[in-house]
Each structure stands twice: as C-alpha cells, then as structure tokens.
Amino acid sequence: MSTSSILHLVREDLRAFAGYSSARTSALQGDVWLNANESAWGNPADPSASTRRYPDPQPQGLRSALAALYGCAPEQLLIGRGSDEAIDLLVRGLCVPERDAVLVTPPVFGMYAVCARLQNAPLVDVPLVDVPDGFHADIPAIVAAALASNAKLVFLCSPSNPAGSAIALDQIEPALQALQGKALVVVDEAYGEFSEVPSAVGLLARYDNLAVLRTLSKAHALAAARIGTLIANAELIAVLRRCQAPYPVPTPCAAMAEQALSAPALEVTRRRIAEVRSERARVHKALVQLPGVRQVYPSQGNFLLVRFDDAEAAFQALLEAGVVVRDQRAVPRLSDALRITLGTHEQNERVLSALQRTQEAAA
C-alpha cells in the first residue's frame, strides 16, 4: 500500500489537521523557559522540581528504546496512555461516525467496542470459533464481513483476551492482502511476550495497512505507568500524533519505563516471562485433572480461561481463599467461565488448593 492509500483510510477532515501546537513542540532553545506558563518553583512534594515542567510529548529516549525493543523505526511508533489511548485514536482518526465500521472478534477485549460506540461507529462482530483445541479467529469470515460492511478497522487480538489463542502470521497475511486499501488491520499484542507466535511487526515492511499494539503493562510489570505503543506506517503515526492530547506521557512514567528497558531490567523480565510460561503449562495440567473443571483452553497469554460445571461455586471458593479472578459469566458464550491470571508458584498453588477443596466438599 502506498503512502497516499494509507492516508486515504484516515478521516477526510483530519488528513491535513494540524492539531494543537504545545510549548514543548517548538524547537526553540534557551535556559530560562517562560513560554508555557509553568511555575518557576518546584512543589514541596517534589524536591528535585522535575515535575514542574510539561513533559516531552514523545520522549525521545523512551521512543528509541521502545523501537529497539519492538524492532521498528522510532518514526513508526507512537507512545500513549496505555493501548487504550491508541485504540481510541485509531477509531477517532479513521472512522466517520455512522459510516465507517469497526470489526471485532468476540469474546475479546472490550475497549474496541467501547471506543467504536463512543465514536458512533457501526460495530461488526465475527465471533471466534470455539473448537476442541480452543478458540480461533475465522480469517475468511473476518475478511468477508469487513468487505461487506466497509469496515475501516479490523481488530485482531493475538494472543486473544480472554480466549488465550494467538493468530499465526500466515493467517494474518491473507487478511492484510485482501483488505489493502480498504481497512487497517490492527493486531493487539498486549500479551505478545508470553506467546510463541512471532510479532506481526515484521510484516510492516510489506503491508502498510497493518498496525500493531504493544504495552509495558503486562510482561514488563508497569501497568500503573500506562505506557502503550502503536506501531504503524510512519505517515499514519504522524497524523494520529496530531490528534493526540498534547502531553500523553508523564515525565516520571517515561523515566521509569526507560529504566525498565535497560539491559539488566530486560534480563529479569525475560526470566519472569519464562517462569510464567512454565507455570502456565503446570497449572493447565493440574486444572484439567480437577473434578468440576469442564475445559481449560490452551493459552499463549499469562492467563487461563477455564469452564466449570459450577462457575459460581468456583468463583466464591476462590474469593473465600482471598483470590480474585476475572468472572466471565456475563460475557456471551462464557456463562460458565473464569479467567485466571498466572501468578507466582505459591499464588497458583493457592488457586489449585481452593478449587480442589471446593470439589471435595461437593463430592
């Protein structure tokens, strides 16, 4: 796809939109900064006075570190307040209300639908297919529905939350080919570090109608810092940056994130990812052997989706043991399911023990 065709997917009224020009976006130099109406003094709670200045809208050190981590150029990357902001920017930037549709694959992360509804964009559901080896995306059905509905955005969550399944790149590629010039395919890789499937970022060199979402909230343990990343065609990134709030990345969060991407920190993160993968296999094996457990879905994430004969009893037993899991029973097609995040070995043992006691009491 050419640059002109990728920009053709952007709302007509935003293609030349200049956005807000903040004081930090100017290239002026000096050592006395009086251009942003900031305080000349630090707050007593901030002895270093480092937070009295507005932050860099896209911190260059962090942007470079994230680009190195994800294997893209810095200009292909937009940092935002979690993946949620990137999802919202994509929907607002590409979808004309009441005209351009957003396609999702339920059961799936709810923010795609929330953002679509806030934009009054038509929502198209192509449910995941529930087969004996887990939930799977029906790519031919997704492509057909996207073309029939004139969808502007197609969200593919891989690994999928809460289903846990990942989409192989050789399945994503036909969707990119079929939807060139018609829709942007957004691959949400929030749980990508836990997956054995390679990142879709490698496909960007061939497909400009691809965007990839990443986050430091999961594997990198920085959920409170709200550091999300959108990776896409550089021209599209530039347009969306102009649609973004002026100062999306607080300075303390950027500094912490940059430290988290240092070599020593990344080594610790890699070890913890390996531990999660090991625990995922162990807990999966233990759960399927418990009476009352109907099905444990294979997972490429840091969680397991589990169906129970009595999900209410299982949920209450875990609460009584002090364990809070995600109740999925209000989600269509998951009325008997709980999503259990993988914790430490000791935390996972607590889950298994509580569920074992429940089944023994019911016997």
Swiss-Prot record:
Pathway(s) per entry: Amino-acid biosynthesis; L-histidine biosynthesis; L-histidine from 5-phospho-alpha-D-ribose 1-diphosphate: step 7/9
Any GO BP: L-histidine biosynthetic process
Domain of life of the organism encoding this protein: Bacteria
Cross-referenced Pfam families: Aminotran_1_2
N6-(pyridoxal phosphate)lysine, modified sites: 218
Broad EC category: transferase
Cofactor(s) the protein needs: pyridoxal 5'-phosphate
Entry GO MF terms: histidinol-phosphate transaminase activity; pyridoxal phosphate binding
InterPro entries: Aminotransferase_I/II_large (IPR004839), HisP_aminotrans (IPR005861), PyrdxlP-dep_Trfase (IPR015424), PyrdxlP-dep_Trfase_major (IPR015421), PyrdxlP-dep_Trfase_small (IPR015422)
Enzyme Commission code(s) on record: 2.6.1.9
Catalysed reactions, as listed in the record: L-histidinol phosphate + 2-oxoglutarate = 3-(imidazol-4-yl)-2-oxopropyl phosphate + L-glutamate
Keywords: Amino-acid biosynthesis, Aminotransferase, Histidine biosynthesis, Pyridoxal phosphate, Transferase
Quaternary structure, from the entry: Homodimer.
NCBIfam families on file: hisC
Family affiliation: Belongs to the class-II pyridoxal-phosphate-dependent aminotransferase family. Histidinol-phosphate aminotransferase subfamily.
Protein name in UniProt: Histidinol-phosphate aminotransferase
Lineage of origin: Bacteria, Pseudomonadati, Pseudomonadota, Gammaproteobacteria, Lysobacterales
